[in-house]
């Protein structure tokens, strides 16, 4: 869930997003330590009166500042590569949904069903009900079962778009003529909001995404009512 004036990530709702949060904390700690060391050295250089005008080289120091950054980069790269491979894995998805980007709305098709598709437009501010979020509500939500692996196929009918839901750790480019895929799995029920994350024209800011994650039995009732 997002909060006003929030500086950090939204609460993780998927295993991938939880991994991304851990990686963010891990990397941020390394950056903080490096920044503290650099600021400390700069402050020493600005305040000390001692100089080493006769020092021409220092093999030990050069060896240390070559090996140490390499080790730090490895410590950052390994968990990053692990998460990248996890995001690409698609193991026996229970459901496949194809989403197409348009100027400026999304269309969805549940490919496992014979005729289950719809367009999803932003609800204008003048038509919002009490409690609904401005610029984030849609007329047709994407209803999906929770705790199940879902494959999303993402493409575009016109220009570049990007289908992104931050709390699920999702961001997939929608490219005309190309079909990208990603997986999602929500560990909790609820409404999860996203937006087009690639500038696609004058109404780019008005392409919200709303996922409604529900238990399987409620999803089955919804899908039956839509057919």
From Swiss-Prot:
Q: Which UniProt keywords apply?
A: Copper, Electron transport, Magnesium, Membrane, Metal-binding, Mitochondrion, Mitochondrion inner membrane, Phosphoprotein, Respiratory chain, Translocase, Transmembrane, Transmembrane helix, Transport
Q: Does the keyword Ubl conjugation apply?
A: no
**So which domain of life are we looking at?**
Eukaryota
Q: Residues that bind Cu cation A1, according to the entry?
A: 161, 196, 200, 207
Q: Name one GO biological process term.
A: ATP synthesis coupled electron transport
Instruction: According to the UniProt record, list the residues that bear Phosphotyrosine.
Output: 218
Names of required cofactors: Cu cation
Topology class, membrane: Multi-pass membrane protein
* Membrane-spanning ranges: 15-45, 60-87
* Binding note for cofactor: Binds a dinuclear copper A center per subunit.
* Residues that bind Cu cation A2: 196, 198, 200, 204
Q: What GO CC terms are in its UniProt record?
A: mitochondrial inner membrane; respiratory chain complex IV
Pfam families, per this entry?
Answer: COX2, COX2_TM
Q: Does the keyword Iron apply?
A: no
Residues on the membrane's Mitochondrial intermembrane side span 1-14, 88-227
Q: What is its EC number?
A: 7.1.1.9
Q: Which InterPro entries match?
A: CcO_II (IPR045187), CcO_II-like_C (IPR002429), CcO_II_C (IPR034210), Copper_CuA (IPR001505), Cupredoxin (IPR008972), Cyt_c_oxidase_su2 (IPR014222), Cyt_c_oxidase_su2_TM_dom (IPR011759), Cyt_c_oxidase_su2_TM_sf (IPR036257)
| PANTHER family recorded | CYTOCHROME C OXIDASE SUBUNIT 2, CYTOCHROME C OXIDASE, SUBUNIT II
> Subunit arrangement?
Component of the cytochrome c oxidase (complex IV, CIV), a multisubunit enzyme composed of 14 subunits. The complex is composed of a catalytic core of 3 subunits MT-CO1, MT-CO2 and MT-CO3, encoded in the mitochondrial DNA, and 11 supernumerary subunits COX4I, COX5A, COX5B, COX6A, COX6B, COX6C, COX7A, COX7B, COX7C, COX8 and NDUFA4, which are encoded in the nuclear genome.
Q: What is the documented function of this protein?
A: Component of the cytochrome c oxidase, the last enzyme in the mitochondrial electron transport chain which drives oxidative phosphorylation. The respiratory chain contains 3 multisubunit complexes succinate dehydrogenase (complex II, CII), ubiquinol-cytochrome c oxidoreductase (cytochrome b-c1 complex, complex III, CIII) and cytochrome c oxidase (complex IV, CIV), that cooperate to transfer electrons derived from NADH and succinate to molecular oxygen, creating an electrochemical gradient over the inner membrane that drives transmembrane transport and the ATP synthase.
Classification via NCBIfam families:
CoxB
**Family recorded in the similarity comment:** Belongs to the cytochrome c oxidase subunit 2 family.
Its protein name is: Cytochrome c oxidase subunit 2
Q: Which organism is it from?
A: Syncerus caffer
Lineage of the organism: Eukaryota, Metazoa, Chordata, Craniata, Vertebrata
